[in-house]
Amino acid sequence: MQSHIKILSTKVLSPASAATLENKGASVFQHNFIKTESILTDADAGLVNSLAQQGLHVIFTSANAVYAVAEKLQFQPKWKVFCINGKTRKTIEKLFTKVQILDSSPTGELLAEKILAHSDVRHIVFFSGSRRLDTIPGALLHAGFNLQEIVVYKTSLTPVQLDENFSGILFFSPSGVESYFSVNRISKETALFSIGPSTTKALKNYSGNISECSFPSEEELVGIAYGYFFPG
């Protein structure tokens, strides 16, 4: 392991997360390798608010989707929610005070299994992003669900070429992986840290030196990198 630790985060970290590594002497480089933005128009607000008046089952797999929907709501929905753990669930609990979270999971695959286990659920609304994976929609459609998907935000790649040889790199999404490796390479010694299974799957195209979070959060990901570089 090299003497001076250089860590790249493919998403700008909170000051506290960056300080966790910097306080041990690591150099932390940060860049948002993807950009997300709501694509819901004022015209879409009517549909969102109409759905909010119905006691629907809905899916959120990203905090970005939660923010996009919340921005257009005129009142609190009374939805029954399935969501991804970590930041997505925390954002739902913060912004949607009247919803009922029926189930949450750390991955899309596990979340799909939990939704399928609810035999009373046959119609469901999925608030998704433009680059979402097919894991959940594929499983639900295969099982005969009436799935209404509404794309509420888009993800754009914002790569930057870096000449540094990093000790470790933090990845937060498959899109972030695609963005980084579109203009960069790594050495075989570089340790990669993944927020979850979908990101890990994308990283396996480039390396086998991958550590994955057991819980999808920035704090957990930084903690894994901390334990890797500063054990004991």
Model-derived features: positions:
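Signature of uroporphyrinogen-III synthase
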Residues: M1-G232
